[in-house]
A protein has these predicted regions:
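Topology signature of small-to-medium multi-pass alpha-helical membrane proteins
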Residues: 2-141
């Protein structure tokens, strides 16, 4: 029981070390690094594999070949948010800016996408982009 309480204490202390929205980003990076990307890389068949880069969908072996790049990015993001590394600013916001661009372009290129859906999705991802850009002082590790 003491070990569980000690673990909860560590998790609680870690949670309060950064803003709640940054914790969500941190835990998303952990999920992508340790759960989704290993599944995607090792278990997902090449025929159904897809990766999005700057709004363009890569499929098959091109997707499989670029998965390690996503893995590295999310792994570095998880480590950077965990330790609040100074190099996370501006790179975290730059990466999210790439996601903003990707969401806009992907919606335009997608047969079911529209200018409205592109604008809405890009606007949604602009929120964490701006928040990360304005968080320079938080990255002090």
């Amino acid at each position: 029981m003491k070990k569980l309480l000690s673990l909860l204490s560590v998790v609680r202390e870690d949670w309060y070390s950064r803003p709640w929205w940054m914790n969500l980003t941190f835990y998303f990076c952990i999920y992508m690094t340790f759960v989704y990307l290993p599944f995607d890389f090792f278990l997902k068949p090449v025929e159904v594999d897809q990766e999005i880069w700057f709004g363009f969908t890569l499929t098959g072996w091109w997707a499989k070949a670029t998965e390690p790049l996503h893995w590295i990015i999310y792994g570095l993001g998880a480590y950077g948010f965990w330790r609040m590394k100074t190099w996370m600013w501006p790179w975290s916001s730059v990466y999210v800016a790439q996601i903003v661009i990707a969401m806009f372009i992907w919606n335009i290129l997608n047969d079911q996408g529209t200018l409205l859906s592109a604008t809405i999705s890009a606007s949604i991802f602009s929120i964490p982009m701006v928040a990360l850009w304005r968080s320079r002082e938080k990255f002090d590790g």
